[in-house]
A protein has these predicted regions:
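A detector for small-residue-rich transmembrane helices and their helix-helix packing motifs
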Residues: 1-203
């Protein structure tokens, strides 16, 4: 199988994940190489927030390391969500959880010089949705839910402990623990809301 065929096959199987990855990488290249001022427009300013920044901040990253860390989690958990909910469900989860995380981050430090950015809140939402969509009466899916649930629980506990200790700093930047937890809560609420919608006859 040629490399081009393999890439085309991957894109056809998970178009939502790869479109999100492409946008995140394109935005980072644009903000670091061609339009540095664009980052300030897209990232969430806590001092003077703009409504669109609660969405666009989920597509902006501070560094390549920051981007690759989130891209890896998006690739793994995003594909899980897309397998269960489709490309639209993945995009909805990414955006809704990104907004939830950014709102939580803003409320934790309103009207300050803080700037929130990164896909971490969306990724934590994908963590939660990815696990909850596996919780079904099926041995294989339940095993997946247990393994993934243990990982997600560990991440949430680490975020909670970090908040309790006053937060952490990486590379001179404060980690958005409130955004992470907000994204996870957004994911849980999204699944609960969707589970209450009436099912189609064939579902």
């Amino acid at each position: 199988m040629s490399l081009s065929h393999h890439v085309s096959l991957s894109l056809s199987r998970a178009p939502g994940v790869f479109s999100l990855l492409l946008i995140n990488f394109a935005v980072h290249i644009a903000t670091t190489s061609f339009a540095p001022g664009l980052a300030a427009t897209l990232a969430l300013s806590h001092l003077v927030p703009r409504w669109w920044q609660f969405v666009t901040a989920a597509f902006v990253h501070a560094s390549w390391e920051h981007l690759f860390g989130n891209a890896f989690s998006l690739l793994v958990f995003g594909r899980m969500v897309e397998e269960e909910e489709g490309a639209f469900g993945l995009w909805a989860t990414y955006v809704v959880c990104g907004i939830a995380g950014n709102v939580a981050s803003y409320l934790s430090a309103p009207h300050t010089a803080t700037v929130s950015l990164g896909a971490s809140s969306s990724v934590f939402g994908l963590f939660a949705v990815g696990v909850l969509t596996k919780v079904r009466l099926d041995v294989r899916r339940m095993l997946e839910a247990v393994v993934l649930g243990g990982y997600v629980w560990k991440q949430v506990m680490q975020e909670t402990a970090a908040l309790a200790s006053g937060g952490t700093t990486v590379g001179g930047m404060s980690v958005g623990h409130w955004a992470h937890l907000g994204g996870a809560v957004g994911g849980v609420l999204l699944v609960l809301m969707l589970s209450r919608l009436p099912k189609g006859e064939g579902e």
